[in-house]
Amino acid sequence: MNSDDDSVFNDDLNDSEITNLIHNIPSSSSSCSSSKNKLQRNLYGEIIPEQYVEIDSSKGYTELPPTHHALNYENLSSYIYPTNFEVRDYQFNIVQRAFYDNLLVALPTGLGKTFIASTVMLNFTRWFPRGKIIFMAPTKPLVAQQIKACCGITGIPTSEVAILLDKSRRNRADIWDSKTVFFTTPQVVENDLTAGIIDPKEVVLLVIDEAHKSKGNYAYNNVVKFITRFNISFRILALTATPASDVEGVQEIIDNLSISKVEVRTEQSIDITKYMKQKKIERVTVSPSVEICELVDMLCTAIQPVLSMANERRIYDMSDPSKINAFQVIDASQRLLKNPTIPEGLKWQNYFILQILNVVGQALRRLNIYGIKSFYNYFDQKHKEFTIKFKNKKSNNQTAARFYFHDNIKLILDKCKELIADDNFLGHPKLEILINELDEFFKENEANDSRVIIFTEFRESALDIVSSIERIGSNLRPHIFIGQSKEKEKFDEEAYLSKGKKGRTKGKATKGKQNSETPERSTSRTSSEDAQIKGMNQKLQKDLIKKFKKGEYNILVATSIGEEGLDIGEVDLIVCYDSTSSPIKNIQRMGRTGRKRDGKVLLLFAGNEESKFDKAMAGYEFIQQHIMNGRLITLAQSNRIIPKSYKPIVEKKFIEIPEENTEIKAEEDEDEIIRIATSYMNNKGKKVTKSKSKSKSNSKSKKIEKRFFMPDNVTTGFQNVTSMVRKADSDKSVADKRREKDLLDKLLDSDTEDELLIQSKKSPVKENQSKRPNSEHICEEDSRQETENNSNESNGSFENENDQNKESGVSYPLSYRQTPPKLGIRRLSPQVSMNINLDAPVATEEAAPLVTGKSTSPPENVAEKRNSPILNSSNRECAPKQKTLGLKRRKANSITDQLKRHYSRVIKPNTAYRTITVSDDEKSVEDSINNQQLHKNKNLGSTSDDDDAFDEGDVFDDGMDDELALIANDKLSSFERSLSPNLPAQNNASDEVYKHEFSPGEGVLNQEQMLELYTSYFSLLDPADRVDFYDPLNFNQKPNTSINHRGRIGHSQVSRRLLQSSKFIGSVSTTTAKNIVKRYAQTYNTTNHQHNMHIVQEITNSSSK
């Protein structure tokens, strides 16, 4: 063993250290802090060099090399921070962090989230001149606001800005290729990514507005997932005022957007309090009126039997009818339907019971929070729908019938009709307090041209508020502000009864009648009433906001449409007519005031609204604090895209806004902002008139070709095998092509075996030829050499060679002298000349006798060329390529043919072969040629097909030929020798068979082994787990009272009878008991089981007596 082998076993670790390493146990000398400095060793115990650095598993990712984006290194040394506005500390800090992390920014409304995004976008345009910067907003109005803010704050040139809001634009690919900054919606980006119009590798910055929408399958998530598949070297900046109402929601946003850092500020944060305007929050708790209490009592009395039935069936737990909650009932219904253990009939009975409770829960909520009018509009529709269906036998729900036909229900509806008929009646005390607050507010702020927004959840409630203010308020100009959807169709008794009687004709006529009456009704309705029925599209919403800003309306009664996403303007008073359990909605409502001047918020509470509001806000503040402290959430990891050697230094600078950007900044209309920016985009920074833009847009554009963003140099689409082979051939070198061409030529059936042999012997020449640049040069060189040979040698060279062959007794057929043209790839036509005087003529088979006459002269254009004293290469013709007939399948010879081939290798004295003393090369060539000629002649004389002929070198030599030769010579093969070891071995070598003898006691266990086996498989039982049986022959045995009877095993029939007998023995005297047992022992028979049973039966009978 050498010194290197010795060093393997000279490990400096002891056994305990090795054990700790195997089980990954830290040693006592090392601490947890030094775990990163562990030495890595290979299988031989050697320390691995230091280039193997341990990756910190806590990171969960590998840091990648610098970004693939093109960088402007001159600008990378600094970043610009605009001083056009007040420099705020929190904005300055957030901008710096956005350069290095995927950032989620949560700021209250009005604190400059857009300024942060604009500053980051400005610097990314300086650093990454070819990168794509995308600003996404969920709605078109928000996109217009961001265009105005970004172009007006940072002065990004409009020539580099693109606005993509129309999905049907034909020149989208040209816009994506020519621009760098894009303002669009996430749906447009998602469609263009999937269509292959955008190259995701070019995206360097993604700004997401209203990031709290990044949940579920929203387009924001799909865009980020798609880009991340091809590009991880880009930054994400997510902006929102309220990330989520719970920890799970915040974590979902972080996971979907790959957020690596969160920046959260609240109104109580130290660094933003000095920038916050004063916002006064006033709470008013309203008690229900007498009318509302009476209606609640009557409704509770009517629903009590249904509620009791639900409690008995344990499908709803609440027993107080006045506290029925519709949301809890819906949750119970869903759990009921998902329960597979309940029979279907019972399941649907319980479901219909819960549906009745759901209607009552919704009615109570409307009555307690919104008033009698909202309650009546909802409950009257439900009552009318069921009663008509039940009377027409469309419904057979007896439980619902007992509720809707209850006496109190009729009293409730009649009382509501009576109250609503009064024009001065206000459905809820909230309305009275609201109108008084509005009157006082406008009186105090009459000179300030103030605005008010009132938020409510239901459209009916919004219309009720507008109607009440218009009737009672003075100098109050309210209008409803709702979404685009139409009012839900109410139950129409006439349409329902006519349905199915006369088919669709009646329905169409009724619909046409309603449409004809619509213009007459619209003239009598107010603008708010008409909007409540038809809904408000974006055009109506925009017109209303304009009128609100101008002062035509000073009060907007809005649903959730006004909570976010619209630039409504400065509002001095926010009234929350109702409150929700969502803190996001509450914060967005209150954030509409106090932006540029002080504001006020009025919260109106009724019932349990105040407790829900406090609970929601307290939970939100708790979550915000933990997010700011970095707890309760798990952040993602992101790689740097700015090289580590660069750390940009701030350069505070006043940004000069270009003229075209000033025009966008001064515009208030959102559609006009988009039109101006689009015109600059289409004309590279030059604004044009509408007529020119229309004429230009009408020009036909090229069809967009879909791009597949695969790895570089990847061919897409379907391809046949031929095209793939051709492409592979085009990538090969000339030498590889020549080698492959020669290999294919060998496989062609049109080639003769002698040509293959000669070319195989001329491999050095082929290697030199493969180094030629192309085949044309080779042909030119060959022709030049042929010309030289023709000039140096005489014209009778072929005749001289034939004379020499005659003298030596060697002659070759015509195929060796001149190869006729064949189908297939161009081949060289070699010639062979044996310039050696042999002792005797070489023998051939009978089918091919020696040719002693003159051989046919070669063609005139063929010259002789000798490269060695044995072989003379032939002239090569550069003939044009011809199509081949393809490859022929070769068949392997049978065993008989292989035997014959094997015998042909052995040269015997009685054969036609004679030993010739020549050199090794000459002998190998000669033997090969003779064997091939013999084989060819044999095939010519036989009836077998030419396909049976194949080159000997192509046959795999598995040693069978030698075995068969031994068999033919009456000799034992090695296999037979192994089966017959007693026979005398040849060459004094015999195979030894492994012998093994077994001792007589082999496989029998001794006592020690038996004990070990027993103790391995059996263990002692705990005394508490033992089961003891009573022995009737042992009179000294006492019952074990400590035994736990939980594991008792049942007795057999004989044992049970013995135990019964033992009770009798214990009751008699000792002498009598001994006699009975003695009798049993004397008469016990080991073979007669029936006799023993008889004795036991006698003892038992005697004991019973």
Swiss-Prot record:
* UniProt keywords, alphabetically: ATP-binding, DNA damage, DNA repair, DNA-binding, Helicase, Hydrolase, Nucleotide-binding, Nucleus
The listed locations are: Nucleus
Q: Which GO terms describe its molecular function?
A: 3'-5' DNA helicase activity; ATP binding; ATP hydrolysis activity; four-way junction DNA binding; four-way junction helicase activity
Q: Which CDD domains match?
A: DEXDc_FANCM, FANCM_ID
Q: Which residues form the Helicase ATP-binding domain?
A: 94-261
Q: What class of enzyme is it?
A: hydrolase
Query: SMART domains of this UniProt entry?
Result: DEXDc, HELICc
| UniProt GO BP | double-strand break repair via synthesis-dependent strand annealing; interstrand cross-link repair
EC number(s) per UniProt?
Answer: 3.6.4.12
- What segment(s) does the record annotate as region Disordered? 493-534, 684-708, 758-824, 850-880, 918-953
Q: Where is the Helicase C-terminal domain?
A: 468-641
Composition bias, Polar residues:
927-943
Q: What is this protein called?
A: ATP-dependent DNA helicase MPH1
Reaction catalyzed: ATP + H2O = ADP + phosphate + H(+)
Q: What's one Pfam family the UniProt record gives for this protein? A: ResIII
